[in-house]
Amino acid sequence: MQHVAIIMDGNGRWAERRGLRRSAGHRRGLQTAREIVAALCAIRVPFVTLYVFSTENWKRSAHEVHFLMNLIRWYLKKEMSFYVEHAIRVVHLGCAQTLPPDVRSQIEYVVERTRSHRGTTVALAINYGGKDEILRAVKKVLCSTSCPDGELLTEEAFGACLDAPQLPSVDFLIRTGGQQRMSNFLLWQSAYAEFYFTDILWPDFRVEDMLRALDEYRLRTRTFGGLE
């Protein structure tokens, strides 16, 4: 297994069920993210992608969006020592240009600071949407002089125009929170991904739950459209 992607769903509902503000769920969700990433690093999963903030999340209340942007900036700064300790290389997925300047600067700092790390690569999908990524990749292709004839375009050439072309295809996509949909996440990269859905809300998702999911993945047979 090369690449595990996670849709970390259920932070707000976790808080609301406890009579707390949604912000409390988002804070607790960050702690869960650290625990899960540390565990995946320990078992040497080479690539992990976390769905942090989608292009659709801008539709939430201005108050919640403002809180999330501040939380993301704070989290990236706080986790720098964690990334160094585990030799994690951080890459960003999503449109950085439309993020608040302070958030964008913090992302750029963490990406540059961890560029030489040789441990697990953690891709943070912030202001990310699968359709948006594909559209931006198409625009790159159209502006490229290396492929003037669309008929010559290959999957490999197109993949090189995605946000993080070094990421391999997703092997296993985990979604917490009870919903069973992709929510515009890694549409190109998940063509042959195995999916795992759980009702557990993200803040309650423990390392044991993740290991149980990985055990189920190992029992599956992937044929990639062929025969067993």
Curated annotation (Swiss-Prot):
SUPFAM superfamilies: Undecaprenyl diphosphate synthase. It is an enzyme of class 2 (transferase). Substrate binds at residues 10-14, 22, 26, 54-56, 58, 60, 175, 181-183. Its EC number is 2.5.1.-. The active site is at D9, N57. InterPro entries: UPP_synth-like, UPP_synth-like_CS, UPP_synth-like_sf. The keyword Metal-binding applies. One of its GO terms (biological process) is polyprenol biosynthetic process. The keyword Metal-binding applies. GO terms for molecular function: ditrans,polycis-polyprenyl diphosphate synthase [(2E,6E)-farnesyl diphosphate specific] activity; magnesium ion binding. Mg(2+) binds at D9, E194. Keywords: Magnesium, Metal-binding, Transferase. Its cofactor is Mg(2+). Pfam families: Prenyltransf (PF01255). Binds 2 magnesium ions per subunit. Belongs to the UPP synthase family. Homodimer. Catalyzes the condensation of isopentenyl diphosphate (IPP) with allylic pyrophosphates generating different type of terpenoids. This is Isoprenyl transferase. It comes from Treponema pallidum (strain Nichols).
